[in-house]
């Protein structure tokens, strides 16, 4: 393991009897994939430290890309996990992402309605806009801009793989540091991917308001936002 076994305890944002929300670090896959190297590290390796007295560790209620940071929801037991899976599948969970892009969209706010499909390219795959793809909708607004960069708030209304990354790239504003859909100059390679799951609203109860959780942006994003004149609460 590349981290201490209990390092996620310091990244715990929310805890109750049904779920946990953690601040996922960038650069660590949430689970081992089919193309993962044997023995490669992933976030699930550290869930045992998050039992908090439960007989089994929590499990993923949804996923974030390896290079995305921020709010990640875990179910603490099978019944809770089923409920969370339904909420995500039905689009009931409201997700807000922050992105810093290389390039500024022509329209400073809007809705991107562009279907997406996974395409095999050579030895790998990527997601592309395709007429016969799955429906994918993202709303966005530019919060700040300067030096050829834009600070964008994006809200996916659907949950397709790489959705925000592909949608913003389609506007001529790929996410800074995106290793797959970005314009990776030598300078860009110095940055981790600037996509952060900033806030999540989860309507767990029918009688109470949704649970709101926010994750602080990583230091590299804060540094760029400061250059753009953005103050973080």
Across the structure, where does each feature detected by a protein language model lie?
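Pseudouridine synthases involved in rRNA/tRNA modification
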Residues: 1-18, 28, 157, 165-233
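Loop/turn elements at beta-strand to alpha-helix junctions within RNA-recognition modules
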Residues: 78, 157-158
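Short histidine-centered loop motifs in beta-beta connectors
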Residues: 147-155
């Amino acid at each position: 393991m590349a981290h201490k076994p209990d390092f996620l305890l310091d990244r715990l944002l929310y805890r109750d009897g049904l779920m946990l929300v953690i601040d996922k670090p960038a650069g660590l896959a949430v689970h081992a994939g089919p193309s993962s190297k044997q023995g490669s590290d992933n976030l699930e390796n550290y869930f045992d430290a998050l039992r908090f007295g439960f007989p089994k560790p929590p499990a993923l209620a949804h996923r974030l890309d390896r290079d995305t940071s921020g709010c990640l929801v875990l179910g603490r037991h099978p019944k809770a996990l089923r409920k969370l899976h339904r909420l995500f599948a039905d689009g009931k969970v409201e997700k807000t992402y922050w992105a810093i892009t290389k390039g500024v969209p022509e329209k400073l706010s809007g809705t991107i309605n562009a279907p997406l499909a996974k395409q095999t390219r050579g030895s790998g795959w990527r997601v592309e806009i395709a007429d016969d793809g799955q429906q994918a909708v993202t709303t966005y607004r530019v919060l700040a801009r300067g030096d050829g960069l834009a600070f964008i708030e994006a809200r996916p209304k659907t949950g397709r793989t790489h959705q925000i990354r592909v949608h913003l790239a389609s506007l001529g504003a790929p996410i800074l540091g995106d290793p797959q859909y970005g314009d990776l100059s030598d300078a860009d390679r110095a940055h981790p991917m600037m996509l952060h799951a900033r806030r999540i609203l989860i309507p767990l109860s029918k009688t109470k308001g949704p649970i709101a959780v926010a994750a602080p942006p990583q230091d590299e994003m804060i540094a760029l936002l400061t250059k753009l004149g953005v103050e973080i609460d």
